[in-house]
Amino acid sequence: EGPLTYNGVVYNEMKGAFSSPDDVLERDIMNSLFPDITYGCESGGDPDNIPELSYEEFLEFHRTYYHPSNSYIYLYGNMDMAAKLDFIDRNYLSAFDSLYVDSEIREQQPFDKMHDLVMEYPVAESESEENNSYLAYSVVTGTAMDTLKCTAFDILDYALLSTPGAPLKKALLDAGIGSDVYGSYEDGIRQTYFDVVAKGADPGRKEEFVSIIRKVLTDTVENGIDPKALEAGINYMEFRYREADFSSYPKGLIYGLDILDNWLYDDEHPFAQVQLIPVFDKLKELKNQGYFEDLIQRYLLDNPHGSVLTLNPSRGLTARKAKALEDKLDAYLSSLSEEEKTELVKKTANLEQYQETPEDPEAAKCIPMLKREDIRKEITPFTNEALDIDGSLFLYHEVPTNGIGYLDLMFDLKDLADEKIPYLGLLKSVLGYVDTAHYTYGELTNEINAQTGGIMCGVEVFDHADSVDAFRAFFSVRGKAMYPKTDVLFKMIREIINTSSLKFTTEDLIGKVIP
């Protein structure tokens, strides 16, 4: 008894994904640019279509594509490669026959003219629809196999949309096109694309949105990109590459994923995405030769393979879809005979029993488990050299840093009056984000990014190994730069510490410095 309903882990997860405006926007952009190929489909499954997938179709898809012949095997680390390959062959590959699997991701044929689409996303009944739309200008920019061009577009994204005073973002915000403006460059797929998005926009200003973008890009081509912004973008990207700081993720895992960005489409150059030093060197040569301006003209202005997407909020959209699904299931239930209804109940009960049955212990043993004895007990030796330089303690650590020098300045706070402690949080938030004697804030940011890997201030407290009550507090200034530019790093830190303009109104402080 009761109505029919759909339920499932992936089904419910994808229903949630299809209700997020950012996810809906990204999906609609992909669909608009690649309507005829894989990228125009939803990899996780569209909730409207997931129930149509039969179990037999699911198994057939798995048999076809989830096979070693369609796999990419990647090993990372210092190892006996022959022994590892022999292990993989004996324990895995030798159990399968070689198959031909056609899993090539083909390219979308270019458009004759840009597509113009209007889509919807759901909002709550209490949420306003006014000035709550998304406007997106997106263009396909070639393939991921051209690492020089891909890296250049990452830098263009920085120069046009991310750096302080970025011309594209500034022009749209100054015109009131959206409450926020951002962009992205997607190079993790075969055909890459660049987009500019205005969030919280009036859909009636779509033509103005496009016009401003094209005017700024045209002016940029004619007058040239700010050289300092390009230099900062190249330096920023090179630093990210050299540091390879992937937070809690293993470096080998991320390298493997980066390699797939090229390897999936080009067997001849699998390591192109992780061999970028020559690319950065080449871009430094090209930055004053019109290369970046030519990319803007060719791909962002003269390229018809793109779309202008308007994503509008729609109150009641979720309820309307739910009602349509309810009516569909009610109609299906009404079409069933009593015998068919009984069979449906029986299948549901069998499925629930299968789901609740504990896993076979023998099957569980197939999953490899990390044991305590597998973990190396020896730690990496840590050494430092303590020096006295003009009465200050200097700790020097010699470690491999891929050509980057790191500097930490620690200022002891033991003599700071208690009533001034709350101001430390404010001080660390404004240093590096206000004008100095020789730079405006925007110029300072570009100079820091062009010459260094960043300068950050903070407050740090260190406890004592032998006492929970003992501690020392420091105000820290941390910076990093390529070895040849460590003197510039010191210069920029002195500029920030000694000449930052710390006289501002409460309005400036709250609205601009620490928004």
Task: Place the predicted regions along the sequence by residue.
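C-terminal regions of mature proteins
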Residues: 77, 233-390, 394-398
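Glycine-rich, charged/polar anion/phosphate-binding loops
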Residues: 59, 115-124, 142, 180-183, ...
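A structural signal for the main folded, soluble domain(s) of proteins
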Residues: 56-57, 82-85, 89, 97-106, ...
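An aromatic/glycine/proline-enriched structural segment found at the starts
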Residues: 72-132, 223-226, 244, 329-333, ...
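A conserved hydrophobic secondary-structure block that centers on an alpha-helix together
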Residues: 45-71
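M16 family metallopeptidases and their MPP-like homologs
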Residues: 1, 23-48, 70-76, 132-142, ...
